[in-house]
Structures are given as structure tokens and as C-alpha cells.
Amino acid sequence: SLATIVSDRGDEVSGSDIEKYIFTQKPLEERHIPITTFSEDHIHEGDIVIIGNAFDESNPEVKKALSMDSVKTYWYHEFLGKLAKEYTSVSVAGTHGKTTTTGMLSHVMSLAAPTGYLIGDGTGEMPKDSRYFVLESCEYQRHFLAYTPEYAIITNIELDHVDYYKDM
């Protein structure tokens, strides 16, 4: 996850989510990243808040963060694009095969040099001294436009996300 990557880079990370346990929590727990339920009390002066794709301005933490000038806010895809610029990045997009391609590519690249990755199944890490970053690129709501990778792979193209895209 993006939280594990930011933690791997040495930054202090905490997060809020729904109460239901989800398998993606395990790597967060392994890194001792605290996860709490939503409360505007979690937002403080000087915080950096990354807003996940599943939440909007009606969320109490998002609402408070967006109202405070001293809190820097990023939508998930914006922060990911900013982070990717710090590495030689490879973005994997397409209708099918993104997760598999991203996983295989990051593994092969890590045999040559330290390589971070972010996969759509919620896994991600950023080994120390990483030079490369392989990310699964989400085309939903044009989020991929926030990424400026040095290399891009498109596995295939089909009509997808028909709630947003009306045609190809």
C-alpha cells in the first residue's frame, strides 16, 4: 500500500479506515502503522493528509483537513504521482493483467537494482536505496493523468469503468 511505501521511506504514518478487518491491514500492522476509525480529532496542524479514493469531502477527517491551511492535502493519485517522480518509474495500465504484470516486472527489476512497487491488490514496498518504482496505474476517473512515468506498459485496451467512460 502507499502507507507501507511511505513508512519504508522513513516517514511517520498513521491512518484511518472502516472498522472491518481487511487483509490489506497485515503489512500495516507488521510496520506498526496505527489504524483507527475516522475522527476529525486525528487531524493536526502541519499534518500531511493523503485522501484515499474511497472517501470524499463528507468524511470528517477529509472535511477538517481541507479546511485547515496548515494541513497539506493530496488526493491518493496526486501523491502517488509526486512520489513516482522521485524514482525512475514504470507505470502499468490496461484492462486486464495489470497486477500480474506489475508484480512480475518489479520482481525481475529488483534482481538488478533496488526497486519499489505498488500493486493494485494493496501490496507495496520501497526498499532502501530504491532507484526504480513500478506502479499499477489506475485509469479510473483519469487518475493515471497524475503520473508521469519514464516508461509505460499498456497490457490491453477494452471498454472498462463504464460508469465513468462512455466509450473507448
For the regions a language model picked out, list residue spans one by one:
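N-terminal leader/targeting and accessory segments in enzymes
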Residues: 1-79
